[in-house]
Curated annotation (Swiss-Prot):
Recorded family membership: Belongs to the PAPS reductase family. CysD subfamily.
BP GO terms, sorted: hydrogen sulfide biosynthetic process; sulfate assimilation
Stored CDD domains: Sulfate_adenylyltransferase_2
GO molecular function, one term: ATP binding
Listed pathway(s): Sulfur metabolism; hydrogen sulfide biosynthesis; sulfite from sulfate: step 1/3
Complexes and interactors: Heterodimer composed of CysD, the smaller subunit, and CysN.
Source species of the chain: Sodalis glossinidius (strain morsitans)
Cysteine pairs bridged by disulfides in the record: none
Function of the molecule: With CysN forms the ATP sulfurylase (ATPS) that catalyzes the adenylation of sulfate producing adenosine 5'-phosphosulfate (APS) and diphosphate, the first enzymatic step in sulfur assimilation pathway. APS synthesis involves the formation of a high-energy phosphoric-sulfuric acid anhydride bond driven by GTP hydrolysis by CysN coupled to ATP hydrolysis by CysD.
Record keywords, A-Z: ATP-binding, Nucleotide-binding, Nucleotidyltransferase, Transferase
Listed HAMAP family: Sulf_adenylyltr_sub2 (MF_00064)
Protein name: Sulfate adenylyltransferase subunit 2
Length: 302
């Protein structure tokens, strides 16, 4: 690909860098959420560009559920060491003490306690007044109507009917004590934009995004990769090796793989050009009930 043919990516890059710099200048204690996925990798790359040759003026925060893929943990630690940024890792201690897990307690309770409550705990503990997230509007309908600067009250709740206008790239970050802003620099990017940018900028990603023979089982119409011995096999389920990759990454028991032969970035991009389904079709948490993502966001989720 010739970078000069992708001027829209340069425009998206410039917009995102402007937003990141704006937040760093406007807020007293910002943080960048780091979920280890492709969007986080792009957002981190943009942040490093925004402040090059200096260091990032804010830490990265990973809210750990204890159920991420092993390759994700390895990639997280490798990336933090390679780039030398401050990495904060928070795991909900109450959830750990209760032994919360997706097999016993289900996806909704696991997500609420380990991700949603864990996130709010970390934001309160460190007193962050702004938090960057890698969500994009093309991912899901509730995210499609959310502003780039997403106002949250002192309980971290989002009210879609109480959003601020964003005219001519002017963002309103005025908040009272205890309130905060969630910031989405990648709002206007698409999944295809993300992959093209990763290719053009040679951004390192978790290998799980590339197709490979992996141990999977079929459950509720999804291909679940068996990542460790905590798997709870149901009667009739069989683990088999299949060529699969992931379009989105989360907790391994709650994230479905897709059958694919795309082992390189150009092959992934080719897949994206003909895809007619959302990348979040592989997320069990989005299937909990109708409008489940918006409900989670109203309660404090990203």
């Amino acid at each position: 690909m010739d970078q000069q043919r992708f001027t829209h990516l340069l425009q998206l890059e410039a917009e995102s860098i402007h937003i990141i710099r704006e937040v760093a200048a406007e807020f007293s204690n910002p943080v960048m959420m780091y979920s280890i996925g492709k969007d986080s990798s792009v957002m981190l790359h943009l942040a490093r560009k925004a402040f090059h040759p200096g260091k990032l003026p804010f830490p990265l925060l990973h809210v750990d559920t204890g159920w991420k893929f092993r390759e994700m943990y390895a990639f997280r630690d490798h990336t933090a060491k390679a780039y030398g940024f401050e990495l904060l890792v928070h795991k909900n201690p109450e959830g750990v003490a209760m032994g919360i897990n997706p097999f016993v307690h289900g996806s909704a309770k696991h997500t609420d306690i380990m991700k949603n409550e864990g996130l709010k705990q970390a934001l309160n503990q460190y007193g962050f007044d702004a938090a960057f997230g890698g969500a994009r509007r093309d991912e899901e309908k509730s995210r499609a109507k959310e502003r780039i600067y997403s106002f949250r009250d002192r309980f971290h709740r989002w009210d879609p009917k109480n959003q601020r206008p964003e005219l001519w790239h002017n963002y309103n970050g005025q908040i009272n004590k205890g309130e905060s802003i969630r910031v989405f620099p990648l709002s206007n990017w698409t999944e295809l934009d993300i992959w093209q940018y990763i290719f053009l900028e040679n951004i390192e990603i978790v290998p799980l995004y590339l197709a490979k023979k992996r141990p999977v089982l079929e459950r509720d119409g999804m291909l679940i990769m068996v990542d460790d011995d905590r798997i709870d096999l149901q009667p009739g389920e069989v683990i088999e090796q299949r060529m699969v990759r992931f379009r989105t990454l989360g907790c391994w028991p709650l994230t479905g793989a897709v059958a694919s032969d795309a082992q390189t970035l150009p092959e992934i991009i080719e897949e994206m050009l003909v895809s007619t389904t959302s990348e979040r079709q592989g997320r069990v948490i989005d299937r909990d009930q109708s409008g489940s993502m918006e409900m989670k966001k109203r309660q404090g989720y990203f």
